Amino acid sequence: DDSFGYATMDTADWHFLPQLKQAKADQAWQQHPIGGEVYPGIQECSVRNPGSCMASGSNGGTVDINASIKATHASWLVDNWAFTTTLNGSERERTVQASAETGYDLAVARWRMRNGKVEVQIANNGVAPFYSNGMEVGRTTLSGDLRKIAVGKTQTFSGQLPADPAGQNTILVRVVNPLDSGQPLRFSSAGQDQTLPGYLTLGRTPTK
């Protein structure tokens, strides 16, 4: 959507969402990432003062970036203006929050370890799926497929670790970035990067 927030919602047949529905692609977000560019004419006002451009949408529509993100299940957006100016504190916070609203939001709901078997229940609290797969716990790969965690749902992943060594042991989990040079993929859970960068600390096993 190259006019995101401006011509996204269903206030005109030629807008992005109606076009998706007409092409029978309105459910494509479940398998393929949706993205686009915030319409250049609203990039500044949507960051500086969102209320000032609410009535600036196409065909009488209102500008609501967050509503457009939720409706399209957008995973990424381009806002060039935000990177070509100096943002004050509230503007930067607003920009970061809008970015955080896009895509997946993985969080560990609970975990347990029994006789070396680790189970991790992961929730997706975002607006879109995680489109790549691959997880590791220590030296064990967890079963399951991150791409199959539906939005608002949870799924349990499990893997077998070597026999528990004596003493307390810290259990970590990470999502492997499919891009060799990509940034670590992070959970929105307390304990992220606590022990090692890129890893979520789940907890410690009981002392034997």
Give the positions of each predicted feature.
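Catalytic-core regions of glycoside hydrolase
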Residues: 1-83
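Serine/threonine-rich low-complexity intrinsically disordered regions
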Residues: 10, 21, 64, 88-90, ...
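Surface-exposed flexible segments
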Residues: 11, 86-94, 186-192
